[in-house]
Amino acid sequence: MELQIGRESGQTLHKILYVFFICKKSVTFCCMNFVKKISCFVLVLSFLSLTYVFAQDAAIYLWKDVKGMKNEPSVMFMHKAKKSDNTDQKSPCVIICPGGSYHHLGLYNEGFCSAKWFSENGFTAFMLKYRTNESFYNHPAMLEDIQRAIQIVRENAKEFGIDENKVGVIGYSAGGHLVTMAGEFFESHNELKKLGIDTGVSLRPDFVVPVYPVVSMQDDIAHKWSRKSLLGKNQSQVRKDEFSMELNVPDNMPPTYIVVAKDDPVVDYNNSLRLYDSLVKKNIPNCKLTVYEWGKHGFGMVNKEFMKAFHWNENLKEWLKEISIIE
């Protein structure tokens, strides 16, 4: 596979784009195709602006060498592991999926802050800018993107200096649903195979971390905006069941660590409880649910009051040690 890797530069441009990112407003045009192109352009500018704040090592475009997919905007940003010693040792890897109701992406606290923390703790981190409904995408675009990201990481493990047997995923809110799909659908919904891509590597992540995740598409606890953005107009009960993660846990589900706050006002925390119950019923090993009394929604990896009170990232780190991803 020939990787399409770009390196960002130009601090003055980044300063301008950072201001643009903070101030930008959504603009609606009459022509849908034009909106799609403009939305993609705005997203690219937004990501470039954030590189001024969070240095990255490379931008890897997912679909540049795939026939019929070359114009797709999906990209992941690599942050190399910071190693204090033994620089020849392969690092574990994590692919990060920000949330945003499958409509947009929460880049700061859920994306780049996460990448920074994982990088500082010995992981090579890939922050995935997957396609969303803001640019008029629905399923299977999102699942295609995360499966493609896993494929690229594993096929290029030697070049990236990572351990191909320690490739995990973490996702927030709707991104939590996406990484759970990656953990459940790597065989039953192989979207790359449908595109004629023979991966030659496993699409099964080695660990899954859904944080305050969207889980269920069932009417009683579904996050309606995420469901609409993912499924589009076809929201039949069959589709709701198919994409309710608590109903589809396979026997070979990866180890899963679920994090949620009980006072979450956006995504009902019972989403997390249902997923965990399903994991337990399936006897999936090394699964854990951590429910915090408060924290609401969207705390991500920002070192604010919630992080200082509960140190959820350090609790995650201990679990990663327990499952032998890190020492």
Annotate the PLM regions:
Residues 18-58:
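Bacterial Sec-dependent N-terminal signal peptides
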Residues 269, 273-277, 281-327:
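C-terminal catalytic histidine-bearing segment of alpha/beta-hydrolase fold enzymes
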Residues 258-260, 264:
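Short beta-strand/loop motif that positions the catalytic acidic residue
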Residues 151-222, 240:
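Primarily recognizes the serine-hydrolase "nucleophile elbow" in alpha/beta-hydrolase
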Residues 56-89:
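N-terminal cap/lid segment of alpha/beta-hydrolase-fold proteins
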Residues 90-99:
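Short beta-strand element of the alpha/beta-hydrolase
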Residues 213-248:
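Mobile cap/lid helix-loop segments that gate and shape the active-site cleft of serine hydrolases
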Residues 106-113, 128-164, 305-309:
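Catalytic nucleophile-loop/oxyanion-hole region of alpha/beta-hydrolase
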